[in-house]
Amino acid sequence: MLEFRFCRALCDIARNIEAQLKFNQVASPTMSFTDPLAQLNISPATITHRGLREYAEVAELVLVEMGADGREHRLTPAAAAAWQALKAAALANGITLIIVSNFRSVQRQAEIIQAKLAAGQLIDDILRSVAPPGHSEHHTGCAVDIASPDHPTLDISFAQTAAFAWLTQQAGRFGFTLSFPEGNSAGYQFEPWHWCFQC
């Protein structure tokens, strides 16, 4: 009986280790940057022409908060601490900030583009608002897409909100910058919701 319990305990430990390894695998680079680009017919010339940086997937993530939809929002430890401080300061000024999107794997980035292609969108149009896999700040675990309760969707009109006005004035104190202002050199549309902690 004792031997059976010992074997069962070992099996439980092995299952826990396997689950942890699978989780870590999600948060570490498993694909070369060229593979997903080729699969999506994204030309290397497009990347070069726009001067897009490569971003590797971060290895260490922590749970920041749970979204209203039940999704886990994860960032690097430093970005998570900065986000909590930013969010608390905003709240003290009557501004509620919500994370809509955060860490995203290379594979997930490719899936987003694939879904848009399947819906009939052209790749050049997609790449005005979605970074190619391997070139998204979301891979770093330092980028957040931010909304507010009165403006929960990610669109350009977020720039007209009190939340955006507050972020524009205060986010820099917490290490966050607006990644894609109007006329940005990377060629993305204006994204008032996309802010990145300078890790």
Across the structure, where does each feature detected by a protein language model lie?
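Extracytoplasmic cell-surface/polysaccharide-interacting catalytic and binding patches
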Residues: 1-102, 106-199
